[in-house]
Amino acid sequence: MRVLVVEDEKPLADAVARGLRRDGMAVDVAYDGESGQEKTSITRYDVVVLDRDLPAMSGDELCRELMTSGELTRVIMLTASDAVEDRVEGLSLGADDYLVKPFAFPELIARVRALGRRATPAQPPLLTAQDLELDPAKRIVRRSGGEVELTRKELGVLEVLLAAGGAVISSEELLERVWDENADPFTTTVRVTMMSLRKKLGEPGIIETVVGAGYRVPSAAAERVRD
């Protein structure tokens, strides 16, 4: 999941970003409204965590712009005001959720995850390939009934490939969807992560390399399972 945090209190913004990254999300940060606007014009985010009181361009203005962009980006507003009229006003601007500072961090993570599920097409409870299962909600991977311990990045890569339904995903797209803007596109990050992921998943191999194009889980192996 790709998330943008727009917050002018730098310590808070950085703390939120670190926490979301620890939960496996790819997170970018902007410290004012104009920077947030610039980032959203370049990158498609699943969720924007948006402070209302921002310099350069207010959170309200940025929220309005996001709502008219036609994207499926979801917005959760942060504010120090717990007045009912302020919450109503924020939601009327088009925000999907509203959280008052100070907040419990586990609650923020839960709300961001819930909004992220709404920002993407509905997925089945499980993504599978051969004898492998990935539960997107619980962030658990099993093969032949046994749990496979993956890092957050490995799990993110696997989830993107399984959800693609056999389509080829380039290294650049994986870097954009699983990492954040600080990832160096010229490094071997994706290749190294892929090697580790394949080793942990074991044999028979599930992930194919398409030379010059990227990676895929063949559609014959990958399927979506419903209840």
Set out the residue ranges of the language-model regions.
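N-terminal/domain-start alpha-helical segments
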Residues: M1-A119
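Short acidic-rich active-site patches of cyclic nucleotide enzymes
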Residues: D96, A213-G214
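The C-terminal output helix
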Residues: R113-L126, G166
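Short boundary/linker motifs that mark transitions into or out of structured domains
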Residues: T128-I140, K199, A213, A221-D227
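Positively charged, aromatic-enriched patches within helix-turn-helix-type DNA-binding elements
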Residues: I140, G145-G205, V211-A213, S219
